[in-house]
Amino acid sequence: TARFVNENNASCLFLSATMPNFIKKMLEDEIMPIEFVAPSPSDQSDREILEKKRHNLKICDGDVLTNIADIVAAIKNSNSTLIVCNHVPSAQLVFEEIRKKGVTDAKLLHSRFCRRDRDAIEKTLQERLPKVLVATQVVEVSLDVDFEQGFSEPAPIDAIIQRFGRVNRKGERSPAKVVVFTEQISKYNIYNKDIVSRSITELQSLSNPLREIDLIDVANRVYKCGYSGEDLERYNNALNHPLIKCYKERLIAGFHYDWTEQIIEKTDGTIELLPRCLATKYAEYQAQGLWLESNRLLVPIRAASLSYLSEYLNKNDDPWIIKSYFLAR
């Protein structure tokens, strides 16, 4: 898209809370020289932003479950707490443990809710924060929420920064407690292990309270060599995808084709399934020609997960139907 608008003398604006230097170079290499606007330490108003202190960080050994007693105690002493896990099953386990320990004002948010239900949950969060929200990476994007404290599984620094951004969001309170654990619950890694390790090491070198500029500097140090390994391969595969390379040949005026979503999904390897409890409603929407409404009942699942979900799947239908209790666990 950026290439296309640039070739047609239009403007394109990139906005990001985390823009490591290597990303800037990649954008310039692929498009054209770009004017980057960032807060300047020499400007007083910008300096106030860069020096803003919103968080007190603690790096804690172990994972969320091994520290669940301390987390529950902290939850009971706070009005609102955010816990972010890297995997849906991990978030479900943590949610169940917290409920078992007497915290009833709790919400769960992850990518295995169908779009309809996820939108409903997000709407309730905008109206009132629960005592605790257990979420996955979905909380990093779009949600304008402000928790009093946060706990997170280990992740790359850019993801950590986004998670911190949901705690003491406006910086109007004294620095809030944020805890990052050194281990995750799941044995499966969705992030580059070296990047996660470097992120934790760099965070450990910081002094409290954290300044915004501290986190920007950490992101640049962690990504000083750019992408590598699987991350670089994934980037190149998406960049060289035929839908991007040959977009001019496929361009039809007035026709909308969600090629970006298709590329991302194929790169990430996801497939949309229909929960069995929603099959009747899906059929009703389809019969009425309500295609958008029916699609909002589908749930994205990583293709890599299908190998151990076979007993829950009915592949005779289109879309495939999955037993609902698996998703609700």
Listing of model-derived features with the role each one plays in the protein:
Residues 33-42, 101-117:
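Conserved RecA-like helicase motor-core motifs
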Residues 19-76:
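Interdomain hinge/linker at the junction between the two RecA-like core domains of SF2 helicases
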Residues 74-99, 108:
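Conserved strand-helix element at the start of the C-terminal RecA-like helicase core
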